[in-house]
Each structure stands twice: as structure tokens, then as C-alpha cells.
């Protein structure tokens, strides 16, 4: 796996699923391939994205700044600086300075990542902030190692939280989660169907599913009534793809 592929993988792991994630993936690909070299426009685009947490925006801004060649005097962005200040906690800053001194002696991506993984996400973000604000300089490889370690820490906590929700025995939470997943799947079906004539059937199924979820929420239904809703939708989607000559069995 190439270095940039690894960086893209880690960064995308902390971005919530949805159309915006696909857009960010495309931007990262373009930046890494050298097809997008307008850092100013990229940062302006990133700043106005909804849904993303300030920290995720800060990490993406840091990655864009590391990758896109820019003039020395280009202004640092406040939204990235604020996100990478470790919540203003002096302990984070102290640890970030210690980490930075270790990273300065390191020259490889994997070496930097190993060192960084023993620090908290707050200290890692603060260390990125030091480098972003030009208070410290490390090689690009080392900076990418720091980025990936930070993303791994964040993704770990997101995964724990997600696992707790999936494993919950509370029927109301499980019911709502199934309806949210069904609704999201229906949206994805509508996007994939596009505007071809054969798409009408898939669009109809997706539309009915969304209406059904809305009705279930409006009238309040038994928690078990949503069981299998997403799987039914996915079966419909796969049947539609088969008719279109597409063989993809990786949705479940």
C-alpha cells in the first residue's frame, strides 16, 4: 500500500458516511494525484462543509496544506488553527511539545506513527497544530504518520461507540437505528438509480421505503416492525443491479 493510499484510508475512516464522504474522497484523490493545486479554494470549500466536526476539518485542512504546493507566505486558516489547539488544554500542549521533539528525530512514516500512537488524540491534534502554525518542522512523511495515528485514535473511539449502539438491547434504539439505516439505503438507491428508464422501479421501491419509515415515525410503531427493512431494500437493489448487468454483492 502506498503512503498516500494509507493516508487517504485513515483520513476517510473518521468522515461520516454519506454523499459528503464521497466528495471528500474525490478531493483527496485529486490532491494526491496533483490534479488540484488551488489550496485557497480547497480550504474555502472545506471550511463551509456541513456535518464535519471541527477536528475532522482541521485534520483535512492539515493534509491539504501538507500536500498542495503553496507559496511560503500563504495565510494559515483560523478554522484549522482552532481545531488543532488541543481544546486549549495546557497539558495537551506540554505533551504535544514532547511528542514533537521525538518526531523531529524520526524520518519514517511508520516510525512516526508508532511513536504518536502512545499519545492521546488531544496531544496529537496539538502537535499537528504546532507543525501547521510553522512553530515546528518535520518531514512530510513524519507529518503523515502523525495524521494517521490521530485518525486511528479517533476511529477507535468511534468504533467503540458504534459497537455499543449496535449491541444495545434497548428495543427503541434498535428500532430507530434500523429505520435510519433503511432510510439511508433508500437515499443511496435513488442516487445509484440515476435517470435511466430502467431505474423507475428502483426509484419507486426507494421512495416507498422512505414513505414507510416516515409513516412509522409519525404514528409510532412496535419496535419489531422495522426488522428486516434494510435487508429487503438491499435485496431489491441487488435484483435491480442484476437486471442492469451489474454484479455487486458487497452491501450487506
Swiss-Prot record:
Region (RNP-binding): 165-252
Annotated membrane topology: Peripheral membrane protein
Region (Membrane-binding): 1-164
Motif (Nuclear localization signal): 101-105
KW RNA-binding (keyword) present: yes
Membrane-spanning intervals of the chain: none
Keywords of this entry: Host nucleus, Membrane, RNA-binding, Viral matrix protein, Virion
Top-rank lineage group of the source organism: Viruses
Record-stated family: Belongs to the influenza viruses Matrix protein M1 family.
Function of the molecule: Plays critical roles in virus replication, from virus entry and uncoating to assembly and budding of the virus particle. M1 binding to ribonucleocapsids (RNPs) in nucleus seems to inhibit viral transcription. Interaction of viral NEP with M1-RNP is thought to promote nuclear export of the complex, which is targeted to the virion assembly site at the apical plasma membrane in polarized epithelial cells. Interactions with NA and HA may bring M1, a non-raft-associated protein, into lipid rafts. Forms a continuous shell on the inner side of the lipid bilayer in virion, where it binds the RNP. Determines the virion's shape: spherical or filamentous. Clinical isolates of influenza are characterized by the presence of significant proportion of filamentous virions, whereas after multiple passage on eggs or cell culture, virions have only spherical morphology. Filamentous virions are thought to be important to infect neighboring cells, and spherical virions more suited to spread through aerosol between hosts organisms.
Subunit record text: Homodimer and homomultimer. Interacts with NEP. Binds ribonucleocapsid by both interacting with genomic RNA and NP protein. May interact with HA and NA. Cannot bind NP without genomic RNA.
Protein name: Matrix protein 1
Amino acid at each position: 500500500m502506498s503512503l498516500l493510499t494509507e493516508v487517504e484510508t485513515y483520513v476517510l475512516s473518521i468522515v461520516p458516511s454519506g454523499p459528503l464522504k464521497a466528495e471528500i474522497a474525490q478531493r483527496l484523490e485529486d490532491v494526491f494525484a496533483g490534479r488540484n493545486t488551488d489550496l485557497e479554494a480547497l480550504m474555502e470549500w472545506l471550511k463551509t462543509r456541513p456535518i464535519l466536526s471541527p477536528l475532522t476539518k482541521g485534520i483535512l485542512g492539515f493534509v491539504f496544506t501538507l500536500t498542495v504546493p503553496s507559496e511560503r507566505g500563504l495565510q494559515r486558516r483560523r478554522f484549522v488553527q482552532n481545531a488543532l489547539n488541543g481544546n486549549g488544554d495546557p497539558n495537551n500542549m506540554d505533551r504535544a511539545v514532547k511528542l514533537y521533539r521525538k518526531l523531529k528525530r524520526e524520518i519514517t512514516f511508520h516510525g512516526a506513527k508508532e511513536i504518536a500512537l502512545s499519545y492521546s488524540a488531544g496531544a496529537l491534534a496539538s502537535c499537528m497544530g504546532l507543525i501547521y502554525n510553522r512553530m515546528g518542522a518535520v518531514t512530510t512523511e513524519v507529518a503523515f504518520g502523525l495524521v494517521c495515528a490521530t485518525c486511528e485514535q479517533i476511529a477507535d473511539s468511534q468504533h467503540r461507540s458504534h459497537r455499543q449502539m449496535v449491541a444495545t438491547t434497548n428495543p427503541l434504539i434498535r428500532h430507530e437505528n434500523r429505520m435510519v439505516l433503511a432510510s439511508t439505503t433508500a437515499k443511496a438507491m435513488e442516487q445509484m438509480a440515476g435517470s435511466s428508464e430502467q431505474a423507475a422501479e428502483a426509484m419507486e421501491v426507494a421512495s416507498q421505503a422512505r414513505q414507510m419509515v416516515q409513516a412509522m415515525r409519525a404514528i409510532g410503531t412496535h419496535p419489531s416492525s422495522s426488522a428486516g427493512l434494510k435487508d429487503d431494500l438491499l435485496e431489491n437493489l441487488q435484483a435491480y443491479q442484476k437486471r442492469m448487468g451489474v454484479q455487486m454483492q458487497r452491501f450487506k
